[in-house]
């Protein structure tokens, strides 16, 4: 399922599309009704409804209930589906790693701070980071296959006069 979601998201990200703009709107504004979404992205109600149904069919968006404070016809409220996929973030520091996992809505599932690790520009250090990340993933309350992305923040410095960036693990460039 995660591979299908990744493929779908990559496909809608190739060009500006209504489903993509709806996802951006949900990320920025949270739960919304169809009229709010339509106004937020500047397209008609039928176009918004079609794109929303497409996202729901992909399992990325869900109906969460009715808007309670509305007069007249009570509109349905939609939001991102938290279980559509998960993300893992890794932030290496010189003497440790910080790792976190979040759901599709950005809600933190778990995090580990100050995991002992020596950040060096060596293949061994990179392999050790991979092992730590794999252990972290194995201990998550979700299946590995449900993880959409693992992002590692790799520090770098830039020499503006040369227009060159130097980062850790530059032995991979050789």
What is each model feature region?
Residues 1-39:
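Extreme N-terminal segment that seeds HTH/winged-HTH DNA-binding domains in transcriptional regulators
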Residues 11-16, 29-32, 47-50, 54, ...:
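Short glycine/proline-centered loop/turn elements that form peptide/ligand docking sites
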Residues 31-63:
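N-terminal helix-turn-helix
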Residues 64-76:
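Short, Lys/Arg-rich nucleic-acid/phosphate-binding segment
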Residues 74-111:
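Gly/Thr-rich phosphate-binding beta-strand-loop-beta motif of the actin/hexokinase/Hsp70
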Residues 117-174:
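Glycine-rich phosphate-binding loop and adjoining helix at the ATP-binding site
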